[in-house]
Amino acid sequence: MIPMIYKEMCPNCNGEITSERLAIGVCEKCLKEENVFEKLKLCEKLREEKTLKNLKDYCIIWNEFKEFEEFVKDLGFELLSIQKMWAKRVLKNKSFSIVVPTGVGKSFFGILMSLFLAKKGKRCYIILPTTLLVKQTYEKISSLTEKNNLNIRVVAYHSELSTKEKKEVKERIENNDYDVLITTSNYLTKNMPKCKFDFVFVDDVDALLKASKNIDRTLKLLGFDEEIINEAYKIIYLIKIGKIEDAMKKREILKKKISKIKHGCLIIASATGKSYGDRVKLYRELLDFEIGFGMNKLRDVVDIYDEEFSKEKILEYIKLFGSGGIVFVSIDYGVEKAQEIEKYLLENNIKAKLIHSKDKKGFDDFREGKIDVLIGVASYYGVLVRGLDMPERVRYAIFYGIPKFKIRLKEYINSLKEKGELKEDINIEGKTEEEIRQIITEKLKIKNFSLRKEDDEYLLLIPDVKTYIQASGRTSRMTEFGLTKGASIVLVDEKEIFEALKKYMLFMYESEFKRIDEVNLEELIKKIDEDREKIKVGRAKGKVPDLLKSVLMVVESPNKARTIANFFGKPSVRKINNRNVYEVCIGDLNLIITASGGHVFDLVTKEGFYGVKIENNLYIPIYTSIKKVNGEQFTDQKDLEELIKQLMEKGERVNAMDAKENIEIIREIADEVDAIFIATDIDTEGEKIGYDIAINALPFNRNIYRVGFNEITKRAILKAVESFKKGEELSLDENKVKGQVVRRIEDRWIGFRLSQKLWEVFNKNYLSAGRVQTPVLGWIIERYNEHKIKVPYLSLKLENDIYIGKIWEDEFDKDEVEVEVKVYEKEIPPLPPFTTDTLLEEATKRFGLSTDEIMSIAQELFELGLCLTPDTYVVLGDGRIETIEDIVNAKERNVLSLDLDNLSIKIDTAIKFWKLRYNGNLSKITLSNNYELKATPDHCLLVLRDNQLKWIPAKDIKENDYIAMPFNYKVERKPISLLNLLKYLDITDVLIEFDENSTIFEKIAEYIRNNIKTSTKYKYLRNRRVPLKYLIEWNFDLDEIEKEAKYIYKSVAGTKKIPLFKLDERFWYFAGLVLGDGSIQDSKIRIAQTPLKDVKSILDETFPFLHNWISGNQVIISNPIIAEILEKLGMRNGKLNGIIFSLPESYINALIAGYFDTDGCFSLLYDKKAKKHNLRMVLTSKRRDVLEKIGIYLNSIGILNTLHKSREVYSLIISNKSLETFKEKIAKYLKIRKEAFINGYKTYKKEHEERFECDLLPVKEVFKKLTFEKGRKEILKDSKIHIENWYKEKTNNIPREKLKTVLRYANNSEHKEFLEKIVNGDISFVRVKKVENIPYDGYVYDLSIKHNQNFISNGVISHNCTYHRTSSTRVSLDGMRVAREYLKLNNLEDYLKNREYFMEGAHECIRPTKPMNTDELIEFLKENNIKLTKNHIKVYDLIFRRFIASQMKEAVVEYEEIYIKDLDEKVEGYVDIKFDGWSRIYNLKLKKLPRIEKSSLKVLDKKLRKIPKVPLYDEGEVVKLMKERGIGRPSTYAQIIKKLLDRGYVVKSKDKNKLIPTKLGIEVYNYLINNYPHLISEERTRELEEIMDKIENGEVDYIEVLKALHEEILSIR
């Protein structure tokens, strides 16, 4: 923990407290002990010490909450996490709204809290929407009071009471004879109870708000009178008509009145939270909360489209998806088409029912499964679109045509005129359809639409997005068990309208439509069904899972908080200390979002050494909360009070703010929630803000986590939350915090010390100096002095409109100039995307805005809102070998990677999965073993080059490079039981039979009796057999079942029962026989082309319970289960299943031996040159994937191999260098060809007397640098290691095993250390045979690995996809996606050329977060009621176009160079554009020149005049200089220039906004540079910037830096 002192931040005494004591909870004065106490224990300790102060109210609440928890436990229940949060709010008497899904316990919470408060003598009122709910709630409460002997009077009124009962209940209500009252909202409308309530719980706000006066009634129930309600409504009206200042004045008066009223607590609960009208805002004015209607944007729907539009397609998808669908017919086809579709489906045996406003029958039958599909018209207020909420039943939706609006074109034009939105008169009478289309596009600014003519009138058709969202949302609902998955299939009837729908879905909901053939429907249906099963099973158990957790997310700005909250619907809002706190439900998190308002603390001014306490060689910053009065910042309380006093004496308005209030808000919410997310910006400043928040929230909540996102989009927020759930949360980086601390202290020390000197000299106490601003001021002065120097300048106008100018001393009297012209084709690459400095430079020039304005605009815009080909094999942590595409899609997390410290292969974690559309050249690298790797040019591989291991990009790999290859390493592989293999392969339609003595079956039988309601349970119990799929579903341990199961078989007539067999070496050897030369047809497995009797004998031994027979040249065995296992393992077709390589080594080796015995070969080949035989060991296949996977595995157990191809057949050849290892590990499992191997082995060994070497290492150049003591080489000779021969041999290779021995005798050196690391490591090397560039258009994939940042790809070590953020031009994969989607939406896919602009350790560039151009942004802003200025639009347009251009192909131009000999100058530009490329989006910054075809040009005009030697700087040019010279940071560029302007050191010229130093600025600079050059020089400033960076990287001790800075400051005299 970093030592810091926070003034006035002790939660108890409001005194100063250290960061260490904040971790304990209170300061030393309050409690001497240093133990961390539980909250109630802390209260007890403070009471004992008699120091309990500010925490007293919290202690009361904590104690009451404990009481409530115990009360609920005594009733026999446990509070859910979310209920605990609600309880704490009620106990604080804070009113609020609950917007959560049905079933998470909100109604029951209302009951529990009412009983608890009633027990304490308080009066409670539960308001429900229906009589049924009133009855059920009354029965529940009555049952609880009776069972637990609670003396609580409960009264319930409802319409089903008898006349006598109604009279009695009304009398009791009239006489206040109750503690808890329960009625419908309808009762409240007609009968207003007279007494005041302490707690009112409204369950279902929609029913309450049917009568808007009920809002007033609820407020009166709480103790507010008519007068105060009317005053509150007056404020609402003033705000509505724009009289904000008047409203604020009245609000201040109202707040004082409310503070004197002891009112009750109101909870408004709803699953939808729809609220209408102005009166509902009374809750905001009087109770500090607003009702939200969250979850309408919460959807997990796969949006699919099919361009085949027909009834037949509806039938096809219903048959595929099954029961539980809705068919929505586009409104323009009407009910008649819906009836036609109903009839068609019924005729095809689909149980379908049409639902519409006049016929709503069918809902219950659909719920019960008697109807499979409902049909309705896609209308926003249709009964199916809005009235259906069956998450357990509705699985998918089919849209027959795109939901659309039909608008009469004439009426639409007239309505625009009436609203004043159409300035010119538009007449469509007598126009052709083509002309009308042009009017709609150009005048009405509608891009995607359809035009129809009905009854001589044109209809405009545009997509009805809200209806689509609402209707498709029926398939994905938030429930107590989480958000369900749904599918939506749109049958496209109008392509133009569909394009508009796609855009809207992308912009508004960040959802991308997928073409039907891009979706794995089998997986989708499986996930949909899993979610429904979860609801079914969960509700059957009758217990609400504790899924919904409450989390406080703290961001920096209120804008950002609001934007994030609005991603998920209209949030509920609470006002705490006059600040908005937003609340939304996002799946299983109840997210509460608030803002810190940026930095909360700053250094004090009047304590320590300029705000730093120095003691015991420590430098401890003393912080206090930032205070502002009318925008002016203070840290000293006395200064603040003095200013307020002065303003009040002058009668001026005082707008005061203390950032401490933000911490108090955070602390209050922290006490309520389960956890806190620190979501400040991920940079140095954001890290310090986050650290301050975290440390000050600690006394109230210890579950604090860091989350981060580099763009404000729904996708990014959900991704950050998902990362946290997976355990990938970030932590606050203390090094960054230390960097910020030092930067601020240094700025304070130098600023205060030098500023005081300036005050003394110039007698102006507003002057300031700083280490960065002073050099920058110097540049502006230096430029100004140069500008004053005048030089002669000649400007010529030549024929053909050629202009040229040059500094020219002499007269120029020529009438003609000689020219040389070159014209050639030239590719012009786009500029990279903007960084902070380039944006400031460009935007200041273009728009004349200040850097400060542009930074502010960019911030507000922000707040709104390397890879491999898919066939690359990656080795997983359990040994499985799968394609990277499958790994990314399945998000497999455990992979093998290389620990670079000791070169050992270890299990690591994939933390990010990348899938990117790529169109460009790939590097195809072919290795000497003929394995191949295809990668994007920047994908890095581990290469031995220049005697070092280096990461080299694929584009820079050369022939004869050596790439690191994992070799002979250990993997923890595990056996798999038969039943678990069946589960893995999804072969679950098999029956398991148990004998009479089975104890496990008794457990199964008990489960069946208790949980299975259908008659099939008797069949299971009677026959003692159960389908495997149910045993899996019921979560029984399959390994335990396998121990006692008697038989297994398929429920097909004639299928033989077989005993459960072991998947041991014998089974996997058999599998190898089939892999080599077998075939599978139905249940029969045939093995051919081998000694048949031998095979038959092997099968007899492996499967003694099955008959096998010889037929022709084949041995046949039949069993449907074994046949399906082999089929799904890929033994004959498809992919060889990667699970094989997760089995124990002996099993895989037996499989490979079986393969050799059917389709392998052992033969001796005579080498005439060496006069010796080589042993050829080879496997063959037409399937490359089989041999590649086996080869990768063989390398892992130390067997070298190469891959060859001849015609269509592949061969895997085992290297003779690995003969001994092959004999030891594979050959012992051979049966049929064992003798052939042994004979070959004996011959080879006899002729090759030297000991076999497993592998050779290409390290001779490093080896040659070793030194040996005298006599040691002789010792090695005795061991038959002649290293002198190694020096002579031409090869670079050295035998690994011999090198190990040699290294024991070598002298110690870095070279020895390097070689020892390699020989003892888990790698060898493979030579690069060939490198090619190949075109590619498709997806590429990558992984981000947590620790080692590499993985095994196609048998070599491959670097992962790293992703860091800083100010740079780097484009992330998300950025590339935005560009790709924009170009695709605008039919510019051919222009795409993704570029990463890679920068090591870099942040991302400035870019848009949505594929939305400026016109679309304006439309988006209108629809979402977001107001931005024209300058915002300009800056966005600039950023957008520059970014999209950076991801497009080069422009190709006919380039012209005109060399003017007489002036020795060139004019350059383009004559013609051959291919526009990126210039289609962004300006081509080249002159357009005429084609010149002669050798001289006439001078038409000439001028010789005096001009300034250099132009003055503008703000953008100064920013560029700061970047180039390493002064300042992106976040401070604009601030530095603003400070120079504010201090009066610099002014801007009126005409061109150029920077001009003032007399004061020049004098201040001269004084500083003459007296303190060592402190404010450019070099010293740059040096300090580098030191700060080192602190942030953990390379330098920040205390030592502060010590040095302190000494430097003390030198100022």
UniProtKB/Swiss-Prot annotation:
Q: What is its main location?
A: cytoplasm
What is its subcellular localisation? Cytoplasm
Helicase ATP-binding domain residues: 87-291
Start and end residues, zinc fingers (RG N-terminal-type) = 1-38
Please state the Enzyme Commission number of this protein: 5.6.2.-
Domain DOD-type homing endonuclease intervals: 1070-1199
The record's section on Pfam families has: DEAD (PF00270), Intein_splicing (PF14890), LAGLIDADG_3 (PF14528), Topoisom_bac (PF01131), Toprim (PF01751), zf_Rg (PF17915)
Q: Which GO terms describe its cellular component?
A: cytoplasm
The active site consists of Y1363 (o-(5'-phospho-dna)-tyrosine intermediate)
Tell me the Gene Ontology biological-process terms attached to this UniProt entry: DNA topological change; intein-mediated protein splicing
Toprim domain: which residues? 550-712
Quick one: which residues bind ATP? Answer: Q83, V100, P101, T102, G103, V104, G105, K106, S107
According to UniProt, the reaction catalysed is: ATP + H2O = ADP + phosphate + H(+)
Q: Name one GO molecular function term.
A: ATP hydrolysis activity
Post-translationally, this protein is described as follows, namely: This protein undergoes a protein self splicing that involves a post-translational excision of the intervening region (intein) followed by peptide ligation.
Domain of life assignment: Archaea
| Cofactor requirement | Zn(2+); Mg(2+)
Question: Which family, according to UniProt?
Answer: In the N-terminal section; belongs to the DEAD box helicase family. DDVD subfamily. In the C-terminal section; belongs to the type IA topoisomerase family.
This chain belongs to the protein called Reverse gyrase
Q: Which organism is it from?
A: Methanocaldococcus jannaschii (strain ATCC 43067 / DSM 2661 / JAL-1 / JCM 10045 / NBRC 100440) (Methanococcus jannaschii)
Tell me the organism's taxonomic lineage: Archaea, Methanobacteriati, Methanobacteriota, Methanomada group, Methanococci
